[in-house]
């Protein structure tokens, strides 16, 4: 007898991150979900910071002090990395949805990871002025 779907639960959420039984497509799915969650968190944080900037010149000056810190720059690099990975993985999903490269999902995924690493390195080197 087949098990009935009982609705969402925390246990079902954590199944996303269980490495057992995942093939390349499963890892691509997990990467897409994690980057989407990270970008959503960043958007919320960004809106809070914009609200602080609305407090006038003192809020803006304190923001600039924070924005020039290496930790903040590293956080920006993480956002850029998530955006690049999410965007390229989205292109892979669109291609496979339309039947392009369905039999070559592994190559597409590792290709997008390679392109992502190169682009993220270029952004990182420019952001940290290296």
Segments (PLM) and residue ranges:
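Membrane-embedded alpha-helical bundles that constitute the cytochrome b-like, heme-associated redox core
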Residues: 1-130
């Amino acid at each position: 007898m087949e098990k009935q779907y009982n609705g969402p639960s925390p246990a079902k959420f954590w199944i996303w991150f269980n490495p057992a039984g995942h093939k390349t497509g499963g890892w691509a799915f997990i990467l897409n979900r994690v980057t989407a969650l990270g970008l959503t968190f960043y958007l919320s944080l960004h809106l809070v910071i914009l609200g602080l900037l609305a407090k006038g010149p003192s809020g803006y000056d304190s923001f600039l002090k924070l924005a020039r810190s290496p930790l903040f720059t590293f956080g920006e690099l993480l956002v850029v990395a998530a955006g690049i990975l999410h965007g390229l993985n989205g292109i892979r999903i669109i291609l496979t949805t339309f039947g392009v490269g369905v039999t070559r999902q592994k190559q597409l995924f590792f290709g997008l990871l390679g392109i992502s690493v190169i682009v993220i390195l270029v952004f990182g080197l420019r952001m940290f002025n290296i």
